[in-house]
Amino acid sequence: MRIERVDDTTVKLFITYSDIEARGFSREDLWTNRKRGEEFFWSMMDEINEEEDFVVEGPLWIQVHAFDKGVEVTISKSKNEDMMNMSDDDATDQFDEQVQELLAQTLEGEDQLEELFEQRTKEKEAQGSKRQKSSARKNTRTIIVKFNDLEDVINYAYHSNPITTEFEDLLYMVDGTYYYAVYFDSHVDQEVINDSYSQLLEFAYPTDRTEVYLNDYAKIIMSHNVTAQVRRYFPETTE
């Protein structure tokens, strides 16, 4: 446990979960067991008093922050004269109430950290899935173009004649712009690829965006025969 004397009325300490366990407490004791939580904090106060001569006189103000590796606690003596005149029993009761309130707040904060951790884990898994799909396309040739707006996407879907059995495709969107990626198998003749690219450029534009960029920053809004899906959900636009 590391103790820092801030001033005459305030001390700050940081204790790792390993230190907590070495003192006979578990991480769960702090957040779920009221009696054990109070016992732990009073034992810390005894150590602080021994090392820093920080005697508990009247009510204390406590701030607790939970981190991945441990807990940081800031403890301040009250400077309010009325509160300093409280009896020892009243001060102890108020200290216990503060401990429980702060433990509850810290537990809620830990729950939020757990939710954030789970969310980041899911995001990493999703990114990993995208990379696996990208890796599976090592033997493919890719065309990526940019559509200025949804109307251009619709026009391409209705007026082009792609050979959909020869490729896989994905429609991405990022920053309000649509990107269309087409993946041709290695056995597809280059002439077919050139013809498909020529049709695309009648409605879209070349782009320097890569598949890696789109997988990391864009959102996939359609996949697997994109043109058929567009025709299904959107009517043909009129000139």
Curated annotation (Swiss-Prot):
NCBIfam families: PRK02315.1-3, PRK02315.1-5
Domain of life: Bacteria
Domain remarks: The N-terminal domain probably binds unfolded/aggregated proteins; the C-terminal domain interacts with ClpC.
Subunit structure: Homodimer.
Gene that encodes it: mecA
Region of interest (Disordered), residue spans: 118-137
The protein, known as: Adapter protein MecA
Family: Belongs to the MecA family.
InterPro entries: MecA_C_sf, Neg-reg_MecA
Native species: Staphylococcus aureus (strain COL)
Residue spans of biased composition, Basic and acidic residues class: 118-128
Sample GO molecular function, one term: protein-macromolecule adaptor activity
Record function comment: Enables the recognition and targeting of unfolded and aggregated proteins to the ClpC protease or to other proteins involved in proteolysis.
